[in-house]
Each structure stands twice: as structure tokens, then as C-alpha cells.
Regions:
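Cys/His Zn-binding finger modules involved in RNA regulation
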Residues: 1-121
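PLD/PLD-like phosphodiesterase catalytic module centered on the HKD motif
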Residues: 2-10, 17, 95-98, 102-617
């Protein structure tokens, strides 16, 4: 047997044996993301596959006629990825499976797969609206591209052209599980000052639905914040149907949208052909060990202002339902006067300069408009530092863990005599490979940079304690989604087997104080907490996990910091946010810093083991 086919067969066997929960949306599921079909079962789709015996059309029942196109594409994804083995002997033959997967890949890429198709079959048929799926909502919002009398498509309009709000014709409550009242986000955002930190609403935890610090994606697009003109979404995983549905329900289905993404997708590759106002670009990576892992938004408004969102959530439904995510939602940054210089409107934290440095690192002409908008905006009131990572070897202190260390060395106010009494609490959704000894990186360069302080002694001394919050197997079992709650925690058993010493650093996910105890964390955050648990020296909210790929590793030869991934986060320092030396963590404090987990952290008990993704195999 062909070795690659054997590996594929093994993978398919593992996928079909995977513990799957039935999708809550049932026959109304509109999802296209392969991750969703890997994690959830869809009986109505599997029934169709059970009755499918050839590479031709699927035997889709008449009752699904209105969503036939959507179901066909969903079935193609399931077969192509090997997520379901149909209950008939013909399709269980490995050679038949391989042939079918090639057929479905061809069909998804628009190739002709019908051997005896008539000439009529090659004619383009106008898309028909589909009644019951969110994917069909996008058809209602298609841009009608002008055509001149000679049949030539006219050039797309520029960013300066106004695109109207298009009120949705469907009820948002019929499609989204948690819907907050419209028109109230501006007041809610203002009340979140001076931190502007939000945690995503948990669908299964009703207590979170009305929390002042909880947020839904629809609230990010709420019109009380201003009328959107265009937006830039920078992310890793993007489920296009879900994202466009969010814009549709906000009335922004015709507004220009640019997407930078890290995980390849056929839908994203071809979206501009279907929707000329949506521009999507895959960010190439130099190494498979690096990821385009940043989660950021730049929202540009019709009045010339903009807002920046730095988040931990991918742009697909699972990340916005029962997972703990965090985001910083900036205040509005107004447009500078026309005579202003590009460097005007800078903040005390140099946020504008840092954001431009990050955007320019892509070297993408598609970002020119957003770079210019940032240059023309006033960031003078921004009180956080942008902390980003970008692939490459860096000799300055502008990126990764040396950026963190440099800022803390200037501004962290922990007294030197108390240095060992303030542990570093690092909370992540995945752990890296650190080697046989923690001193090689974890309690070496990483801990050294994340625990720097002002007036630090140059004398060598023991580092502060490191407490790593990462869910145990027991934590995941009690999650809202049972074992599937671990779908956002990709730490592997093989990696853990090589560093058993890590167990002594691990602490459980406990978040009863924010009603997120059963919502597994995809958030990543770092802080230093006083011995009595009443104060924090800083708070870093970021996409970066505790890994070398995210924060970098030092090249001992030339001193360069080697980073493999794109990441973005914001660092909150008390001096800039509250004009004090520390953040208060006390319940009734006036400017209380709300962290998503319980303090003090609870250590793993004897016999506990960290969650590993192999449990889903």
C-alpha cells in the first residue's frame, strides 16, 4: 500500500473513532470549517453519505432543496478530510476513498468533474437565495458590480466611496445564541474605562450574558460606536460564513472587509470572486513551526476615526461560545487635522509607532489603506503598550519576550526586596516543548524577562516562583462541552512525555469568580500578583502561549532573539492606566483589574495530569 495512503487511512480511522457530540444546530447548521466537522456529528449529513455510492451528485432529500448548495459543500468537506466513514462497503475501500477525496477537492476548486457534462452544464446559473442557513445570508448581501454596455466589469469603487448600511432581513435571534440589546455598546464601553478589557460571553453560562465586562461579536460591531466604513481582521483561523453573518446582522454586509489569515481555506482564497468588497490574504510563513497567530481588528468609521481590538479569539463560532476569551477594545481614536504630521497623535506608550511597526512588518500592499488610516489617527489617549511578535531574528528589544522585559525594566514597580514574593502567573491554552531542564528556557530567559522590575539588582539571584495555569484532564471533563471542551487546548502527550518535570509548575483552571469555571480557556494572560493576592504589578493579555515560537529564544552566538510566529497583545502597566504603582484586585476597588480566573491559583493535586489533545483521538 502507498505509505501516504496508509497514513491517511490511519488518520481517517482516528477521526471516525473520535468522540463526537451532535451539533446543537442540527439540520440548521451552516458551518464550513473543517474543525467543526472534526469535533461534531451531523446525523442528517451522515445519512446522506451512507446512501451515496458514487462520485456523482449526493442523494440530498427534497426537503433540503433550499439549502442544497450549502449541504453539498459541507459533505465535500467531510469526505475530503475523512471525518466520516459511510456505512457501505464500497466507500470503505481505501482506493475508493482516495479517488472520492480527489473528486471532491476538484469540485471545491471549481474543476470539471462530470465526464459527460452537456454544454448547458457549463453555463453560469445565478445564485438563488437560501432560506434557512447563515451561509445563504451572504448571498443577500452580494455586491452588484456595475457592467458597462460593452459587457466589461467596471473597476471596483475606492475606499472613499460610501457604502450604505443594509438592514438584515432575518432575525438575529434565530441564528445567534446570545443577543444583547442593540445601541448600548458605547455606554458599556465607556463604563469599562480605564482598562477597556472584555471577556467573551459564555453561551452555556447565563450569568455571563449580562456581565458588564462580557461581550459578543455583535456588540463589537454595534452602531452606537459609530458607523463602520471598512475593517481589517487579522487572525489565525477564520470561518468565513460565520464572520460574514456577523457583519450581515450588524447591517455591514456591503462594507469593505480585509482579512489576513493563517490557516488556509478554499473559501477565503476565492471569496473576492464572489464578494468583491471582501479581500482575503493568506500570510505565508517561513517555517511550519511558526503560525500567523495574531488576533487583531482595526475598525474604521465613517467619521474618520478608528478603534483597535486586540483579542485571543479565532474568528469562528466555537471560540465565541463556550470558551473563555479576552480582548482589549480601544477607545475611539479620532482623525487628526489635515495639517497634522504622521507622527502626531502619539500616546505616552508609543502605541501608534508600535502598531505601525507591526503592520509594516507584513510588507503587504493590501494594508496600505489601513496604515495610512493609523497615521492619520490620534492615539494620544491610549494607555496600553502593544506587545507583538513577528518571525525573524531580532537584535533590538521591539519584539517578543525582550519587548516585555524592556518595558517591565522601565516601569514595573515591585520593590527589589519583595521580588521573590510576587510570583509570575502565566495562563495559557497550550504549552511548548521546553527541553529536559526548565532552566533551558522556561525558568531561564522566559521567566527572567517576565519578572524584570525597576531598580533591579545586577546581582545573580533566584528567580520568582512561576505558576502555570493550564487545564487538567479533570478540569476539561467538567466543562460545558465535556471532553470536546479540550478542542482548543492542543498540547500533545508526546511533548509532555519529554518534560515530566513540568507537572510541578502546573495549576488548575478555576474561574468561579467570573462564572467561567466550565468554559475552557483559549485566553492567554500573564501577571504578577502580590503575596496577599490583593495587588497586581501588571497584566498582559495576548495571543501568545507559553512557547518559544511565540516569545522567542535567544541565540547564544549572536544574541539575536529568534521568533517563529506572529502574535499580538497589550500590556497594562499601573502607572499609565490608573496612575498608581499597582492594580487593585479587590472586589470593591474603584479601578479593579478583573482577571478571568480565581486567585490564588490552585495547584494540581497528586495524580492530576494536564489535558493533552490525544484524549480526543
Amino acid at each position: 500500500m502507498n505509505p501516504s495512503l496508509k497514513r491517511r487511512g490511519t488518520m481517517q480511522e482516528n477521526e471516525t473513532k473520535r468522540v463526537k457530540k451532535v451539533c446543537d444546530y442540527g439540520e440548521k447548521c451552516y458551518r464550513m470549517n473543517p474543525v467543526h466537522f472534526r469535533e461534531f456529528s451531523h446525523p442528517h449529513l451522515e445519512s446522506i453519505l451512507d446512501n451515496h455510492t458514487s462520485g456523482g451528485d449526493y442523494p440530498i432529500p427534497d426537503k433540503y432543496n433550499l439549502q442544497k448548495k450549502l449541504i453539498t459543500e459541507q459533505l465535500d468537506v467531510i469526505i475530503e478530510k475523512g471525518f466520516y466513514a459511510p456505512r457501505n462497503n464500497v466507500q470503505n475501500n481505501p482506493k475508493q476513498i482516495e479517488n472520492k477525496q480527489e473528486t471532491y477537492r476538484d469540485r471545491r476548486e471549481g474543476k470539471n468533474v462530470e465526464p459527460e457534462a452537456s454544454s448547458a452544464s457549463h453555463q453560469k446559473v445565478p445564485d438563488k437565495p437560501e432560506n434557512t442557513k447563515i451561509m445563504s445570508l451572504n448571498n443577500e448581501a452580494k455586491i452588484k458590480t456595475p457592467i458597462d454596455r460593452g459587457g466589461v466589469v467596471k473597476e471596483k469603487s475606492s475606499y472613499s466611496d460610501y457604502r450604505p448600511i443594509i438592514p438584515p432581513t432575518r432575525r438575529v435571534e434565530d441564528y445567534l445564541n446570545v443577543v444583547r440589546p442593540k445601541g448600548r455598546m458605547a455606554a458599556k464601553h465607556e463604563a469599562s474605562a480605564p482598562f477597556y478589557i472584555f471577556y467573551t460571553t459564555i453561551t452555556a453560562a447565563k450569568e455571563t450574558h449580562s456581565q458588564p465586562f462580557s461581550i459578543t461579536f455583535q456588540e463589537i460591531l454595534d452602531r452606537s460606536l459609530g458607523e463602520l466604513k471598512c475593517s481589517l481582521q487579522i487572525n489565525f483561523m477564520v470561518e468565513l460564513g460565520w464572520l460574514l453573518a456577523q457583519y450581515y446582522f450588524a447591517g455591514y454586509s456591503e462594507k469593505k472587509l480585509t482579512i489576513l489569515y493563517g490557516e488556509d481555506s478554499q473559501d477565503l482564497r476565492t471569496i473576492s470572486q464572489k464578494k468583491p468588497h471582501v479581500d482575503a490574504h493568506l500570510v505565508p510563513m517561513a517555517t511550519p513551526f511558526g503560525k500567523h497567530h495574531t488576533k487583531m481588528m482595526i475598525l474604521c468609521y465613517e467619521d474618520g476615526s478608528l478603534r483597535v481590538v486586540v483579542s485571543t479569539a479565532n474568528l469562528y463560532i466555537d471560540d465565541w461560545e463556550n470558551r473563555t476569551q479576552g480582548l482589549w477594545f480601544s477607545p475611539k481614536c479620532p482623525e487628526l487635522p489635515s495639517e497634522a504630521m504622521p507622527h502626531d497623535g502619539e500616546s505616552p506608550t508609543m502605541f501608534k509607532k508600535s502598531l505601525l511597526r507591526y503592520l509594516n512588518h507584513y510588507h503587504m500592499p493590501h494594508l496600505t489603506y489601513y496604515v495610512e488610516r493609523v497615521k492619520r489617527s490620534d492615539f494620544s489617549h491610549i494607555n496600553v503598550f502593544l506587545v507583538a511578535s513577528a518571525p525573524g531574528s531580532h537584535f533590538d528589544m521591539d519584539w517578543g519576550m525582550t519587548r516585555v522585559g524592556s518595558l517591565l525594566r522601565q516601569h514595573c514597580c515591585i520593590p527589589p526586596e519583595e521580588q521573590l514574593q510576587w510570583p509570575l502567573v502565566a495562563q495559557a491554552s497550550s504549552l511548548g516543548s521546553y527541553g529536559k531542564d526548565p532552566k533551558l528556557w522556561l525558568t531561564g530567559d522566559f521567566l527572567h524577562n517576565f519578572t524584570k522590575i525597576k531598580n533591579q539588582s545586577q546581582m545573580l539571584s533566584s528567580p520568582p516562583t512561576l505558576k502555570l495555569i493550564y487545564p487538567s484532564l479533570e478540569n476539561v471533563k467538567q466543562s460545558h462541552d465535556d471532553l470536546l471542551g479540550g478542542g482548543c487546548l492542543p498540547y500533545a502527550a508526546e511533548a509532555h512525555s519529554k518534560q515530566p518535570w513540568l507537572n510541578s509548575f502546573l495549576y488548575q483552571w478555576r474561574a468561579a469568580s467570573t462564572n467561567r469555571n466550565r468554559a475552557m480557556p483559549h485566553i492567554k494572560s500573564y501577571t504578577r500578583v502580590s503575596k496577599d493576592g490583593r495587588k497586581a504589578a501588571y497584566y498582559l493579555l495576548t495571543s501568545g502561549n507559553v512557547s518559544k515560537a511565540a516569545w522567542g529564544s535567544m541565540n547564544k552566538g549572536n544574541g539575536a532573539l529568534r521568533i517563529m510566529s506572529y502574535e499580538a497583545g497589550v500590556l497594562f502597566l499601573p502607572k499609565f492606566v490608573t496612575n498608581e504603582d499597582y492594580f487593585s484586585l479587590e472586589q470593591n476597588a474603584r479601578n479593579r483589574l478583573i482577571v478571568p480566573y480565581d486567585l490564588p491559583p490552585v495547584k494540581y493535586t497528586d495524580g492530576m495530569s494536564p489535558w493533552v489533545s490525544d484524549y480526543l483521538m
